[in-house]
Design a protein with these regions (language model features):
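Predominantly extracellular beta-rich ligand-binding scaffolds that present long acidic/polar faces
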Residues: 1-103
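C-terminal accessory segments
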Residues: 77-145
Length: 145
């Protein structure tokens, strides 16, 4: 889950603080909750709130704000349905047989070929050292398929 807020409430008092720059690119925001992303801006204060999310697969209700550019929203909101995932293995029920979670993209993943080439040029290698730009269509997330 990801929460980006420019406020917090402590002891019944709302405190605001600036979010001067929060940028998420070529990423996957996915998990076991129906809503995996929360953006919150205190509109009663003048605290900065500069959030940009681009070329990202998000599990949650589609939000229509300028904060999102070329984002893709997960089709299903079923909390426990493992087929909603875009990864090879995130099913905790079969850990003994399958090994631990595998966050590499599944062959049918919705996150394949959706990345921005300009972003992947800045970060050309995935966590395995694989070239994200080899096929000209970078994938979202930490691993290139």
């Amino acid at each position: 889950s990801v929460r980006i807020l420019n406020y917090v409430t402590q002891n019944g008092v709302r405190l605001t603080f600036p979010v001067t720059s929060a940028v998420i690119e070529n990423s996957i925001i996915f998990g076991g909750n129906a809503e995996e992303l929360e953006l919150g801006q205190d509109t009663t204060s003048s605290a900065d709130y500069n959030v940009l999310i681009t070329n990202t697969l998000i599990k949650g209700k589609k939000l229509e704000t300028p904060n999102f550019v070329d984002c893709h929203w997960a089709k299903s909101q079923n909390i426990r349905n493992a087929s909603d995932t875009v990864f090879v293995n995130t099913n905790i029920d079969n850990i003994a047989e399958t090994g631990y979670f595998n966050f590499r993209l599944d062959s049918l993943s919705h996150a394949r070929n959706l990345g921005s080439v300009s972003v992947s040029t800045l970060y050309p290698l995935d966590l395995d050292g694989k070239d994200r730009n080899a096929d000209g269509n970078p994938d979202l997330g930490a691993y290139e398929r």
